[in-house]
Amino acid sequence: MLNNHSMMSAIEELIDDVVANDTNATDFPDYDINDSFSHFEWAELAPVLVVYSLTFILGLVGNVIIITSTLCPRLRPLPATPTNVFLGGLATADLLLIIFCIPVKIAKLFSYTWTMGIFLCKVVHYMQSVSAICSVVTLTAMSVERYYAIVHPMRAQYTCTISQARKIVIITWITSFLLGIPMIFTQTHKQVGEKYIAYWCVRDSEAGLLWRFHEVYMLIVVLILPLSIMAFCYATICWEIWRVMKRRYHMTSRHALSPNSVDTESIPMTQRQSGNERKSRRDENDDELRTIKQVVKMLVAVVVLFAICWAPMLIDNVLTAYGCLPRLKNGTHKHLNTVFQLMAYFNRWT
């Protein structure tokens, strides 16, 4: 029989099935499902349970509010804009994961085995993969939309429309369902134990090449390729904003250095009105520029947060698949592995 430490390490590994860390069934021929229920490490389970619970409650409420605020015509307090349409699609992707996956994972915290059959084993992880892909593709589409709206405003008048945004959201969902298909083949419903039969829902390490390909594939699709596009779009946007601000600064400086010793009473009324109109237009332009900067900052913050939350787990998956990190996490590796997964779920309600 496994000792408590090795059993809890294996069990914790399987609880964290988001990461590709599984073990061969023959490694645990004496696995006893009844005996495993008598070992609860609350110091390790409690933080995971708290974060999953907060993710479900806050994510459910927050994403429903965003969806109703951006996509529901009768309840929509926010203006109908392409950016808000994308935000609604992003919230829908996160809500999908929360409804279909979080309750299942909370149940797994206390079962240590998979009792819901092979269908849900594959569907739950497939929907999680679809949600992650849909989120990052939507974020990428938002960055491209902002790029056209700010760098190419004339072209954006007929490309960055609400109808176009809705079409892109639909295409994003279809693409995400297709790109998530490899997860179905890498997740396996594995029988463990000989005297006491149980099942685990883990990555199929026996298909080593497929497993490694899938982890690299997810790293490229979810992180590297989208972030490259986002980095280009936002770098170009920042450069354009800096260029516009610099030009306006020089125009204002030249206006301030112009002769001003003339008594204002000697200036004709029509010129005074013209000066007031220019000042009013300048104030409107400044307000518009501040709004653009706020929107860009918000979108950049969303992208940076997504990268920080997902990169550690995706990189850990690849290193584990290629044998650079142990499949069974013990000590520091186990705690870091748990933190990486909690970071990924934290992204769902931030």
Task: Please annotate each region the language model reported.
Residues 50-53, 57, 61-64, 99, ...:
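Generic alpha-helical transmembrane segments of integral inner-membrane proteins
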Residues 11, 238-289, 323:
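Intrinsically disordered, low-complexity cytoplasmic regulatory segments of eukaryotic proteins
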